[in-house]
Amino acid sequence: MNEWSIDDARAGYNVAHWSQGFYGISDEGEVTVSPDPKNPTFKIGLNALAKDMVKAGVSLPVLVRFPQILHHRVDHLCQMFNQAIQKYEYQSDYLLVYPIKVNQQQTVVEEILASQVSKTVPQLGLEAGSKPELMAVLAMAQKASSVIVCNGYKDKEYIRLALIGEKLGHSVYIVLEKMSELQMVLEESKKLGVTPRLGLRARLAFQGKGKWQASGGEKSKFGLSAAQILKVVERLKDEDMLESLQLLHFHLGSQIANIRDIRHGVGEAARFYCELRKLGAKVNCFDVGGGLAVDYDGTRSQSNNSMNYALAEYANNIVSVLTDVCNQNEQPMPRIISESGRYLTAHHAVLITDVIGTEAYSPEDIPAPEEEAPQLLHNMWRSWNEISSRLDQRALIEIFHDTQSDLAEAQSLFALGQLSLEDRAWAEQCNLAVCHELQGLMNARNRYQRPIIDELNEKLADRFFVNFSLFQSLPDAWGIDQVFPVLPLSGLDKVPERRAVMLDITCDSDGIVDQYVDGQGIETTLPVPNWSAEDPYLIGFFLVGAYQEILGDLHNLFGDTNSAVVRIDEEGQTNIESVLAGDTVADVLRYVNLDAVSFMRTYEELVNSHIAEDERAMILEELQVGLKGYTYLEDF
């Protein structure tokens, strides 16, 4: 790696493919964001932005939101469906419905709604999956189309609130997830004097592939079978309310990577739609649910972290399949609804934080073992010396295997009391030296050596201790092995001479990022430039805007991070519009029913009992500051 250019950095981190044009690397080697696609030359340096916030008193880690990205995602998705509708001469329209479960933060929901302010005909609705979410959307939906889709399991209170939504001027679709909900809707609608808008969630036979595939298929947690759907139709006929059935919904699962799965699912659901129309139901909305994926690793593949289609292809497939099936069955074309929350929100947020320290292997001179040392150590010494004399590629593999076997035996003998601590330490250092030399000699183009190279990269990787909680800020990385792009925010104009793994500050061995976007694939380590306390750089975790905040937990009582809303104006100036303080220690204690006020009283009693009078005020002040302080590290 004697020659290095910014283009190498851009390709190495695959930024152009996962960023959708929102993020990039400047010629100076700094990560930038272009939040306003209307002015792509306007860029914000994330490193400089973070330093400005720190100077203003905002401690890291900080979650930075770029609302202009939300606006663009809404507009772009609607535009692609509108173009597909025109292309296939589809005889209805498209409505984007945002499921607030993806990110319920007020700033996020309000910015998504604000994208409709200038629209003559709003093309956005909201979805709720619980009573708290329904209460929120009842107060917010009028800022867009006033369309509300109610999913999830429901009780009488949920149903009454949804029906009250109709009285408030909203168009509220109550999607039946199970048979018992129909009876409650019929009873409560009569009591309130409201004609309900009903939807059905069909349980398709087809099941898409992916981490969330259980959301679809015949064994899905939600939805009605074909027989149950017929019972609903018959019951509504008996009640003379069949016209209330207006929406068909299905869901293949989140993050569907293969466009064929989407096409197959839409085709089966379209047949349900046509059959319902033939039975006399006036269904006029076709809700494809979620599934629109985000290309987290930028590989444009069928992996769980990617997608093998573009947005236009997604819209074209849905519209074309519906057009064909409706024409074949001589049925009117319904309004198309999608609940594409992950696509809307993932890119808009970046977690920025600092490295509090590193551990790195540095080659050391290895002395020859004493003549009377165990034979095992002499074997390892021979392997070390053979590296320089046996340079054929097969010999390198043999040396690696021999050394690993010898190290395992040395550790076993130590555990049995047959090897001294000094001998074990020598064996481990010799092994590291051998691995370090082999790492430089092996060739990634040799397919037999690739697995060993990966193992060496992982074994010799620097350990970056990063000021964040994986469980709070990237829970899907821990829970379902979701990949999120990770980058140093500066120094990318330098050769990445090291490889590293990112460890969080929780007391949990699972608190490690073990997958990284690297070129056109996923690796277990990340290439990074040299890091030092004298010349540190910050770390950015990207595409964290969907699900991560609401799923994050309080492991070790690390709470919500600070967050900021940042916008770029028409002159290209950066505006930090608002900063929301993260959780204090007192906040997280309260979440687990621990009372900071009573703790303070206890501290006072202990201080009065154990601390000299001239120190009491100082000690009490530090304890009080501790309760009011940030849960993350601030002084290191």
Swiss-Prot record:
Its EC number is 4.1.1.19. Its cofactor is Mg(2+); pyridoxal 5'-phosphate. The keyword Magnesium applies. Keywords: Decarboxylase, Lyase, Magnesium, Metal-binding, Polyamine biosynthesis, Pyridoxal phosphate, Spermidine biosynthesis. One of its GO terms (molecular function) is metal ion binding. It holds the Pfam family Arg_decarbox_C. Pathway: Amine and polyamine biosynthesis; agmatine biosynthesis; agmatine from L-arginine: step 1/1. CDD domains: PLPDE_III_ADC (cd06830). The keyword Metal-binding applies. Substrate binds at F286, D287, V288, G289, G290, G291, L292, A293, V294, D295, Y296. One of its GO terms (biological process) is arginine catabolic process. It comes from the Bacteria. It is an enzyme of class 4 (lyase). The modification N6-(pyridoxal phosphate)lysine is found at K101. Signal peptide: none annotated. It catalyses: L-arginine + H(+) = agmatine + CO2. NCBIfam families: PRK05354.1, speA. Belongs to the Orn/Lys/Arg decarboxylase class-II family. SpeA subfamily. Catalyzes the biosynthesis of agmatine from arginine. This is Biosynthetic arginine decarboxylase.
